[in-house]
């Protein structure tokens, strides 16, 4: 075989590998806040619940969830959630209307530029500012039109990372550290910390500041309840679509009650 033919074959093979890699890895979606207006609600996110505004942190524009302001204005959260849900999904949804009454204690903001996330990574930097009842910062994902969702969050008061599911108006933990395994976690609230979710089919992994904290397989059978009692029926995958693979839904930011946190560098890296 001639050398030129060998080179041609090698180039074709390399091109095929490159094309394959391109097909597997889609373009990253990096949230750019540079054109957002400080003091206003973010344009790139749809605040479904809670008080979300653009703030200034040194040289950077950031997203701020103001838990104190939200706590003081809990008279209209359901109406706000329904109005914003109609913007995203186009129609009224009776299931969402029922669920909206239940998730008023969880401020959430949905990213507008990602219609559906199934595989890949989602990462964000967060800084905890304050909170009397809670100090939570999280990545929202698998958001369904009926208001069901999954979230991975760091709680600055418990010093742990937990994966939660929200279904039929009720939030339950899918996996959390055991009492004897509570993490030390980052105590320095003046610094930014990195939270990263990796989704590979049914496999979920959560990293905090570069250290893996949780691994979970969607569709897994739940552990028995306390004292060997049967598990909650909603934690059985056959009864609960949001905990069955594959992941498929919108993504965003999550908080809880009176938590006040800052977020920046939100990046979605899809993988097909």
Residue ranges and their predicted role:
Residues 216-264:
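Flexible glycan-contacting loops in extracellular carbohydrate-active proteins
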Residues 22-26:
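Sec/Tat signal peptide C-region and signal peptidase I cleavage site
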Residues 1-13, 17-20:
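Bacterial N-terminal signal peptides that target proteins for export
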Residues 70-169:
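Secretory/extracellular carbohydrate-interaction modules
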Residues 33, 122-124, 187-208:
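Short tryptophan-centered beta-strand motifs in secreted/extracellular beta-sheet-rich domains
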Residues 98, 107-115, 179-187, 240-241, ...:
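Beta-strand-rich interaction surfaces with strong enrichment in secreted/lumenal proteins
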Residues 40-92:
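Extracellular glycan-recognition surfaces and repeat-rich motifs
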């Amino acid at each position: 075989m001639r050398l030129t033919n060998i080179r041609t074959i090698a180039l074709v093979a390399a091109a095929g590998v490159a094309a394959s890699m391109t097909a597997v890895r889609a373009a990253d979606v990096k949230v750019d806040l540079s054109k957002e207006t400080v003091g206003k609600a973010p344009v790139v996110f749809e605040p479904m619940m809670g008080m979300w505004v653009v703030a200034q942190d040194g040289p950077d524009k950031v997203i701020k969830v103001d838990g104190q302001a939200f706590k003081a204005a809990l008279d209209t959260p359901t109406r706000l959630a329904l109005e914003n849900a109609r913007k995203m999904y186009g129609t009224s949804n009776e299931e969402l209307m029922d669920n909206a009454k239940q998730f008023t204690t969880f401020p959430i903001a949905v990213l507008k530029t990602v219609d559906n996330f199934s595989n890949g990574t989602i990462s964000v930097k967060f800084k905890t500012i304050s909170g009397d009842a809670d100090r939570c910062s999280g990545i929202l994902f698998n958001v369904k039109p009926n208001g069901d969702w999954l979230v991975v969050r760091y709680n600055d008061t418990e010093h742990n990372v937990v994966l939660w599911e929200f279904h039929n108006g009720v939030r339950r933990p899918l996996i959390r550290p055991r009492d004897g395994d509570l993490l030390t976690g980052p105590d320095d609230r003046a610094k930014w910390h990195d939270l990263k979710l990796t989704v590979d089919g049914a496999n979920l992994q959560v990293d905090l500041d570069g250290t893996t904290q949780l691994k979970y397989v969607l569709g897994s059978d739940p552990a028995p309840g306390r004292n060997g009692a049967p598990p909650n029926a909603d934690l059985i995958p056959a009864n609960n679509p949001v905990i069955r693979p594959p992941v498929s839904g919108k993504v965003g930011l999550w908080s809880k009650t009176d938590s006040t946190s800052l977020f920046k560098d939100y990046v979605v890296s899809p993988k097909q």
